[in-house]
């Protein structure tokens, strides 16, 4: 993760012309880091003795990053970044813990992974598997900044770090 962010800084903040970084293999690298980070965070949330406190710290840390980027780099704001997501996911998980605990672990793993894959491209307007659209979602869902946090960004929405509840919450659980 540190190496990835070092290269991100060099490419996007320092203007290093490195075409590979915007290619397929860099995307795979980035996604493997994201998925691992979110899976581990979800696991730690389940084991935490203070998930509300940790969720609030993550959420407000993400809010501070969003505010800072809006002020310092308004052309590259971070809206609904990974810290905001992790905090929100932890806070949503707390009241759902009793329900989630009733699901057998193997079934929970299969359901969560399947729902993650199904909702993977919800921010592009559909449910499907591996870039194969199965269900086009209503355009009305993609209307404003609040819906972007859920996973339905409006066409003009922009964020340099975007982790909406859908699909990532399924990976967190």
Predicted regions and their residues:
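Alpha-helical transmembrane segments and their immediate juxtamembrane cytosolic regions
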Residues: 1-173
């Amino acid at each position: 993760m540190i190496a990835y962010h070092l290269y991100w800084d060099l490419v996007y903040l320092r203007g290093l012309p490195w075409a590979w970084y915007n290619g397929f293999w860099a995307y795979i690298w980035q996604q493997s880091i994201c998925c691992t980070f979110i899976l581990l965070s979800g696991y730690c949330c389940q084991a935490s003795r203070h998930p509300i406190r940790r969720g609030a710290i993550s959420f407000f840390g993400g809010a501070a990053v969003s505010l800072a980027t809006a002020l310092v780099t308004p052309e590259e704001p971070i809206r609904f970044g990974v810290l905001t997501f992790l905090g929100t996911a932890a806070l949503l998980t707390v009241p759902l813990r009793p329900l989630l605990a009733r699901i057998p672990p193997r079934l929970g793993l299969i359901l969560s992974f399947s729902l993650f894959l199904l909702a993977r491209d919800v921010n592009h307007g559909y449910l499907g598997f591996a870039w194969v659209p199965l269900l086009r979602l209503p355009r009305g869902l993609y209307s404003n900044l609040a819906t972007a946090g859920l996973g339905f960004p409006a066409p003009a929405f922009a964020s340099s770090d975007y982790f909406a509840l859908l699909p990532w919450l399924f990976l967190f659980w």
